[in-house]
């Protein structure tokens, strides 16, 4: 068995790699940071192939698929956020975020999905966020990208179900947890986040139970439920105030 993980050099990607290695998966670890991948490899008990790539590039994503064909589990984990009013945030950073958070997920999912359907076997885990559900003033582009990942993944689930395929797909929607995401996005969370170890363990359990939507933590589940019943304008006010507290 072999798993391919993007954004594998730190945080959730790193923890997922180590845990899957303990379950017997050989690994293909993708990141822009080869040195950090080397450190992850030392903690893995199975074969780990390291591949330096920037998944914001369409060509890089296609090359990954061409180079690593025999994949049983794809985890699209690479992603980042950006804090600020839409009128003030960097357009270049936002476009890069869309490339990483959306385009790369779309390309790699689509390419590997075709392979998995052909052999009627395989799993895909796309990492979204609880941010997929509420509106996201002050982190607008990030929330929008995660909403795309959620809808994209759940739609594929139904397509697979209708065709009677054995291929499984899941979407992980964690709340705040402790990774380098905060530093990159330029935020600090007002609520104490879950540990990365907890989120990765919960993700793997949900993945192998064939859960479609994986939401770690009771508080995060409550938050998800509230987004389904609260009026939109109330959600906008609540979310804006929560986002403002994140400002470093």
Language-model regions: role of each:
Residues 171, 188-224:
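C-terminal helical subdomain
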Residues 109, 145:
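Active-site helix of classical SDR
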Residues 77-82:
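Conserved NAD(P)H cofactor-binding loop of Rossmann-fold oxidoreductase domains
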Residues 23-39:
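Conserved glycine-rich Rossmann-like NAD(P)H-binding loop of the short-chain dehydrogenase/reductase
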Residues 9-10:
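Conserved glycine-rich cofactor-binding loop
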Residues 85-86, 93-98:
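Substrate-binding pocket helix/loop in short-chain dehydrogenase/reductase
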Residues 129:
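Residue(s) in the substrate-gating loop at a strand-loop-helix junction
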